[in-house]
């Protein structure tokens, strides 16, 4: 059957036409008007019209399914399953637009019915499995049925008798009846029923009609299901909806896409009303007779009901009802003001509330936007706010219960907010952050933020409060899982439980009983303990695969389960268990609350306890707290902003202490600090800077701990000293490990090495920007204090008779230096020239850190564990500031007076392009190391000639003969096991191969990082780059691959071009491109035979330069100017050179080379690196003389590359520099200065000699010539010793004969059994030479002289060409008791063999002598091909439509065949749509709506799965215009449950080359598979690898990059 043409929908009719149609209904019409849904629109058609054309009522719809009307108002209602909405329009209003009636809580509203008397809408939802009712405007919505429903569909009303009817096509198909108020539910039809789709009531005859799409009938029965009769049977294809008028039934059919009619009594008089519809769905007769008016008890005063008045079949024939979740008061008329006990639920992208007052547990979505990944949720019963955390938005937000008033409270310095808790008494909000590993608090409005706990937290999760007792409890699921307790101010912290815990996710307090409950997602238990830590016991441990959210209200504990996708509850005493919600994905936290009940109080409830900011009730007293940056006054209630304060480092923390009051030590909430050492600040930006000698970084943050960032993170070893130049906005530091003093801008830019010579263990730094001096101490063999200009020049020793001077500080007012001496245990001072030395304090146990402010000096003492102060001139009035401190490294006073003054750099950076460096009386402009300053413009130019060398985790730059700057580590992120490096001098990109088998690139300042190749992006995941080289002219990168043993080429923009060289035995490794001459040189590490080869850049013209004197050549470099090739052999430990042609081989160096791994040429020198000796050395490249060590003590060396400037003239002169020489792929410079275009091996050059295209479509038994006039030759001619291709490519790269083949003298290989068979098979007849030799002992000699194995004799198969091995077999056969069967087959066998030989000879003569050789001009292939490769597209069709046929002019040659499609011809459509295949598993919240079904009973009534539809043209899938989404996302019964969050710990190795292995799946939802269970967090910090999949609901839709979602909970990725 051909597909009926789909007509474009007509334009909407003029409003006047609808008015005329509607008004025509007022008088009795001769034929009814049919209202039907057509997916994309709702239409009207006159069933008795002449033209039978439909009129559009509503257009531009997504997926209109069910439809009904209210005749008295002219209103039309319909459901849209794509928009998940119920909508309305009017027939009698000009230009009426569609209105939304119900837009939330719907998933698949399949059925719709209008109660025209009670003015209600009823509908079914086959996904939520509910039947609901609401007023016609959508208000007072109520769920009537939610249990024992399984795919409800059609619904019909009989308001006169108070009944509703519906069909259910689930596991137990049936038709049910109930009162319209939800009472007297009864099954009336449950036999001989399969897919009951359509349903309608004959109000006049009191009959019920329904259509069954599977059994293909229309039946009727009495309204109680009795007296069932057939109306139409057997001849229906796929009836969907039906209605009636008078004696006529009307129905829609999915397969015919038509509306049909018949007599309702007999089923006869069938006719087609309207055909060629887009997709006819529900249908109604738009007539007054279908909605007769009558009086009901609800007419007057809504029956006395406050909300819903629903008709009923029982006296008084109506019932009052309340909206979902609200209880009816005892008077039976009035509803309560709202739900009292509510379960608040956080899902991934929405919040929901579930009333616990009513048994339906319907979840209602809060209308709050921009929820991306909600985690935890809580509620404030006083103000009615819902609070939640969102770890994708990185914020804490709140809104009212109805979704209004949404606010963002906290969205700065918050990484992964997890648990949340409301202190409804003190009006504070607590939360845990598993990213920053903190517990913090604010006021409920988001102000007065303070960190309470920041130490010894690993993965804090749930948090609950006990305001009455002043305690808080939280869980930590880190390496040492535990449940802890502390006061509400974070003090008096102690561990409550730390044994037999895995992932304690949920936590709940029973305030009345004094008990603490928790759920563990790893041990799969719910446990309880007294709040004092006693009497621990297990409440539940059955079928708890992965608890996450957890809460308690009254007698019940509620929890969410990630794997079961359910919300359940258990009685806390009886342990009885119920399921609240089942099969709802993306479940996170939940909170059960009584929305109006406030429990408990404390002194903070009265005037905030007298506190100005935060009030904390604790078990001992009420305490006031201050937000970050404020200090508490001596009244212990008021917080102020301090004028000055002390800041000090103490290993992993940085603290601030008030100078005014004691006991005010506050840890600055900084993340990622390991071992802070030096400390300074920038008062103008309120920044604090510190060095970390463990992380080897310099970092900064605001004084409140926010915006932590690394300023310097490369090339540091032990940065012990640091100082901020607050005028020039520069940062200075001293590195004891590298023996350098460096400077950079405050953001880390323009880094310059200032001093690196004659430094011996530099330590503390101090700056005097006003005077232009820098001061530092040295701890080397001769300790001293040194001064220099701030540009690093004019160094001089100020103090030389000193011990280990530490923490140098300056009194800017009195112009004096202060320092601590660790050897003499004194604090000393001098003037700024090192003179007038005086001891300020002596006999100190161990003074270390030092600072000065006003009239005092402040110092730390490691032995006393204290901070003290004293008079700065006399050392008197010593005062203890703080005790009980360990290892305070540095100390300073944060105050503006410490950073005052002016110099030239304050204004416009001194007009300098990069660095403005103060010097006495002025300033000097400076540049980043290796950059050159232009004195006139004061701008800096990057270096053009330099060396790059790589280590395992770093790439450095150096200029060998530059005495002004040493080598510098480049700020390149993510370097891991760097193997090879290269550089593009045009675009200034560094390229490297890393340990993850990627080729990456970035600018030398670390910007614009990108990846050229990776296992996940490449065509083959088995790629392992070894070496790389760049052709700067054609903008391509060549690289060798260890895994595939190929040479590949990429464009520098990242596009892969393909393979240029591969061979069966090739193992190319080191590579060097000589683009100026069009060649590449490479080492070929074949088994036991290393070679150095040369080839053209397209892999052709291969030439072996050297095969001897090589063992393991590891690196190559080309010097084009000198015309030399250099290489180093790691096993022979020598460096050699030769001409580019391979001549004049010369050994340059072979002494004291231990482990060479790379070499390069720069200027007059040849450089190499030696990994074992940790050195970079060089010699003169022509003679090998003047060997010099360039750099020493460089560990883990891996590569070296020289960069020289390429002039514009030199570049422009290259033939490939302009537009790649016009080539589409590879451009090669020829000797005459012109370009030659070529292609990778999988493509061929087309006739225009510029463009590469697919190879010619030679048949599988043919060989494709690379270039030339001839495209295809028979495969047998390949490697036969006679070149047939014009370019002789058929004789290139011929394989070595296998063990079962005989090698002919001219290279041809023939079957070994054809050797000495009496007939020449080699072209040179060498297989028949020397055939008189004696056969081996285990061989049989044929009559022809051929030798075959003895075991092949008499095996019933002729192995000798003359068949002599099968002769005389019966004579030589051992005696047997069996009677031999008579056979006379020997003669015919010999005849057949001889015939075959004759035919073969004829064929050979025909092919070789008589037949004209094929040339491209006479072939059927497109002659635009000039070259080719032996690959044939699967669906090639020769030009002219011919798919096969002999070569023209060659009648005796083979035909050229191409593969043909098995699917069908053009325009065919698939039998099903994979996107909507029945039973397809999806993990999306919007589409995962299945439940775990028992074994299959019925396939769903869908065109996609109905066998009767497989041979038709219309399928309801997104593949054809019929629909963009199936009307019903059918789910096959018995399929697996929807996918769950990826539940494996994925550990990504830095250097692994293996692919991901397939996952295993849960067979039992009640057990975890240790040790690889799903981690209990949406964002695990342990998963940092770029290819890893975070095991959380956050990955439920994507399952990490391109991998498909698993069809069930996964437990292992091993």
From Swiss-Prot:
Motif PPPSP motif C mapped to chain: 1573-1580
Listed Polar residues bias regions: 1007-1021
Region (Beta-propeller 2): 340-601
Primary site of residence: membrane
Signal peptide boundaries: 1-30
Processing and modification events after translation: Phosphorylation of cytoplasmic PPPSP motifs regulates the signal transduction of the Wnt signaling pathway through acting as a docking site for AXIN1.
LDL-receptor class A domain mapped to chain residues: 1257-1295, 1296-1332, 1334-1370
EGF-like domain: residues covered: 294-336, 600-640, 901-941, 1212-1253
Region of interest called Beta-propeller 3, as start-end residue ranges on this chain: 643-902
CDD domains (alphabetical): LDLa
Motif PPPSP motif B mapped to chain: 1537-1544
Region (Beta-propeller 4): 944-1211
Glycosylation: residue positions: 92, 137, 445, 498, 704, 877
Sequence motif PPPSP motif D, location on chain: 1590-1595
InterPro entries hit by this protein: 6-blade_b-propeller_TolB-like, Cueball_EGF_LRP_Nidogen, EGF-like_dom, LDL_receptor-like_sf, LDLR_class-A_CS, LDLR_classB_rpt, LDrepeatLR_classA_rpt, LRP5/6
Subunit architecture: Homodimer; disulfide-linked. Forms phosphorylated oligomer aggregates on Wnt-signaling. Component of a WNT-signaling complex that contains a WNT protein, a FZD protein and LRP5 or LRP6. Interacts with FZD8; the interaction is formed on WNT-binding and signaling. Interacts (via the phosphorylated PPPSP motif domains) with AXIN1; the interaction prevents inhibition of beta-catenin phosphorylation and signaling and is enhanced in the presence of GSK3B and WNT1 or WNT3A.
Family of this protein: Belongs to the LDLR family.
Protein name (database record): Low-density lipoprotein receptor-related protein 5
Name of encoding gene: Lrp5
